[in-house]
Amino acid sequence: MRLFSNEQYCRIFELCNSKPKDKTWDDIAKQLNTEFGGLDVSSSCYRKCYQYYMLMNNALKAKGETAVATRILSISDTHVPFELPIDTLSDYKGRVDILQLNGDICDCQAISKFGKVYRVSPMEEIIKARKYVIDMIEYVQPKKVVVTYGNHDIRFQNYLAKNLDNEIAELMPKTSLELIFVDGFNHYNKREGTKSWYAPISQLFPYVKIDYADNWWTQIGDTIFAHPSAFSSGILKTAEKAMHFFRNEGLMFSELVMAHTHRVGEYYIGNTRIIEQGAFSDVSKNNYSNGQLYNSQKEGFVYLCQDINGKTIREKTELVALN
């Protein structure tokens, strides 16, 4: 059994690397034990962990390799109820430290402005999306889940704001993802006269940290994960515009992983790599642009590896196209 999680190991190396001269190893151990929830680990143990990592890292550097500290699996655009089977991720089972869900978990099909020949109940979508995410966490077994919202998720708030008085709309969250991950929700089945409570996912996995960003982007190490509402039909142009936006905002990053476009590709602009990660949904059933002569939608996802300093190891990145 491992004494520390990958995230804790990263914190150990970070603190030990920057250890001031006036701090002893006992001081470091006391600080880390407090941060890790009251552990009682000796300074000798922390020192040996750090020394072992440095030994392995130096050996890998001598071979021209870099030690992996954090493995990130980024999935976006599941568009429940059009999601792909979870066993599509079978090669990554047990190989993920952070599961990053990059928006558009729910399709919000019934409340979209697009024409539709049938409707899927928003409540049905939310219940199914919650179950899908639970199954994915159990299957992939990450240590942490980081969630951003997408333009389809934000339809929830926009629809309420358009169709309800402000006073009523203020009773509801911005997206259905808050209900799924943070707040939980009740389902009032009027036909059957039942009331069912669905606990938030954050309460179901005590050993998995759930981080709902409540934003359309987040940053992990040197990588920004984003799901904007803007769209450009040019190849990788949406990702390029996003890169310039974040640069203008003063953010420091080397990698940009973009959801939203349902395309798969990567490109280098200077020292920055931009990636469009594709959709983790069955695009044949979710064809918004049918007949509009856009490039066809692509299914895919991204698997990133970072070193102890949060720098992405590019040669170990996998951009996976599924169709």
Language model features by range: what are they?
Residues 38-60:
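Major-groove recognition helix of helix-turn-helix-like DNA-binding domains
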Residues 1-13:
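Short, Lys/Arg-enriched anionic-surface-contact patches
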Residues 229-315:
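Conserved beta-sheet core of the metallophosphoesterase superfamily
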Residues 75, 80-191:
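Core catalytic region of metal-dependent phosphoesterases/phosphodiesterases
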Residues 163-239:
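Active-site-proximal loop/helix segment associated with metal-binding centers of metalloenzymes
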Residues 74-76, 98-104, 146-151, 225-228, ...:
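Active-site neighborhood of phospho(di)ester-bond hydrolases with catalytic His/Asp-centered motifs
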Residues 16-34:
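Short, charged amphipathic recognition helices of the HTH superfamily
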Residues 64-72, 217-224, 269-272:
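Beta-strand-turn-beta hairpins that frame and shape the catalytic cleft
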